[in-house]
Amino acid sequence: MLRDKSLTYISLFSSAGVGCYGFHMEGYHCIATNEIIERRLAVQRYNGKCELPSGYIAGDITTPETKALIYDEIDKWKKKGNDRVDVVIATPPCQGISVINHKKNASDINRNSLVIESVEIVKAIKPRLFVFENVQAFQKTFCITKDDKIVRIGDFIRDVLGADYIITGKVINFMNYGSNSSRTRTLVIGVDKDYRNTFTPYDLLPAYRPEKTLRDVIGNGTFKALDWGEIQEDDFYHAFRTYDPEMRAWIHDLKEGESAFDNEDPLKRPHKVVDGMIVENIKKNRDKYTRQKWDRFIQCVHTRNDQLAAQNTVHPVEDRVFSIRELMEMMTIPHYFKWVDYSLDELNAMTDDQKRRIYKENEVNIRQCLGEAVPTEIMRQIAARIKEEFCKKRVTPTDINKIIAKYGLDDKETMNQFVADNPEALSLPELQRIVELCNAKREENAAYYTNKFIVNEIMDILPDFSKDEIWIL
């Protein structure tokens, strides 16, 4: 945290920075961002995430050299008045492996061991908080430690960091927490135990909301219908991605929810011609070459969203895959986010030939980054909640006793009015603590205040419930 109380963060395995851009939107200062692929890190530069050019670190995080560059940036920010890194965000590659009866190969385990690097960097940096985002099975997936032990990732995180942090892991579908598309993922949040009596990871999770439909997000005239190969004149990122024209017949007559594999005419089913004979493609997944439905939730955005043959990519009525702009809306990426080193106005002013050249050079990278990203709104909400917690007034036990005496809170009616008015702008845990201390019968009735840390620990070990009501025996 800087002297002006503004917050700082570090982002690891940051790709194009789509997710952690949410922290940028909330006014956080990016100390360092690490990504091994330069073309993705370049996108972060275009968006001005880091104030210092040296904050963009391209390199393998497993090497001492890359780690040293990150630590050097922390030192630079200490000289600028930063007392401590506030948040470390990490989205390490993780190969999902079933915990039962599943063969694990060396490359899978090595990829999962990048989680080890993230955890060890958190331990070295000692931020106030950390946020890991990953696949649904993240915590149950195996990784290999530096001493060659194979352990579950969730257990490893708690073994290494549990002494210093309150840790919660939660599996949620992002479409119910701020994203516009389905994406079931794990969030693991750790909060320094110094804050155990004021806020916990559960206070930082994004808020629940009903999912939106495809029509809500890109329908009802939000986007112009596109002709073959058209790039919208006033929005470079809304464009018709072309493909082999012979494939158009496969999807042209489909209604919402129908697949090209359902066409009665074999010439309209996905196929190739070998020695003059039609050889139909194998139908591996129902959702390939399938028109999406307007009035259902938006399916997960995948990395191969450029292909008709990929999952859930075909527009409900137009003969094309979703445009980059439509995908940005699905992933809650701000309209002004830059994918190339030109402003939207500059892109729109270019000739068609110039626009197509930029698409040719950048479209695959953009679409892959979209498919791998954390929706911006998810991280923005977490960033906003962290900031809100740090902005709240904190009081010591001595201060609480002074407040009780100042307002005469031993009187029940006075206490009720104090809680309703909250003239000292206290946080909820502090109000609860005051109520407990002023309850003369707390020992007789065992009416003790249970702090948030204990509640968080109980919640963290509970299983996920699928029913609205459960019986507890």
Residues of each region from the PLM?
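Core alpha/beta nucleotide-donor-binding catalytic domains of modification enzymes
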Residues: L2-I125, Q136-K140, I144-I150
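C-terminal target-recognition/interaction regions appended to catalytic cores
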Residues: R241-V395
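A detector of helix-start/N-cap boundary segments at the beginnings of structured domains
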Residues: Y9, V317, R442-A446
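Class I S-adenosyl-L-methionine
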Residues: M1-R3, S14-G17, D72-R84, C94-K288, K360, R367, A373-E388, R394, ...
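Short, solvent-exposed loop/turn segments at secondary-structure junctions
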Residues: G17, E38, P93-G96, Q136-A137, ...
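Conserved proline-anchored active-site loop of SAM-dependent methyltransferases
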Residues: S11-C20, N82-N101, L129-V135, V188-D192, ...
